[in-house]
């Protein structure tokens, strides 16, 4: 994967940029999804993740349920697989929110919550090559003016 997606935020704005998109984009409030393609590419895992994220955000948002969402290893049904040119078996492997594979897979997942008061909760969970959970780092801080 030679492309990248990058998010930058302060207390007021969230920006997304990719080396595959024509220009940076300031994101309006809402639920977005990103994988190894452009923002909101309608791959099954992006659509599924956005739906679950929206549901989590309607309740009392917390970091742990977000990390659990990102840890989902269920794969898409055959008819929901995209055709990115890697073949059906690989498409199936890559259709999980958390890809488990020794050669190529999810090595960390990050959840960030920003409250209206500027309080930020940041957590990152690391995984080994066999998919085992390694550790979780947690930080809390406030955006300053």
Go through each PLM region and give its residues.
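N-terminal nucleophile
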Residues: 1-145
């Amino acid at each position: 994967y030679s492309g990248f997606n990058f998010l930058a935020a302060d207390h007021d704005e969230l920006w997304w940029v990719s080396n595959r998109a024509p220009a940076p984009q300031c994101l309006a409030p809402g639920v977005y999804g990103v994988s190894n393609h452009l923002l909101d590419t309608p791959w099954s895992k992006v659509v599924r993740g956005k739906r679950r994220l929206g549901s989590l955000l309607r309740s009392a948002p917390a970091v742990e349920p977000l990390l659990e969402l990102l840890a989902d290893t269920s794969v898409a049904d055959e008819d929901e697989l995209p055709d990115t040119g890697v073949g059906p078996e690989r498409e199936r492997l890559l259709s999980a929110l958390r890809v488990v594979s020794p050669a190529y897979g999810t090595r960390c997942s990050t959840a960030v919550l920003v409250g209206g008061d500027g309080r930020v909760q940041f957590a990152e969970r690391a995984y080994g090559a066999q998919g085992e959970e390694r550790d979780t780092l947690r930080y809390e801080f406030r955006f300053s003016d």
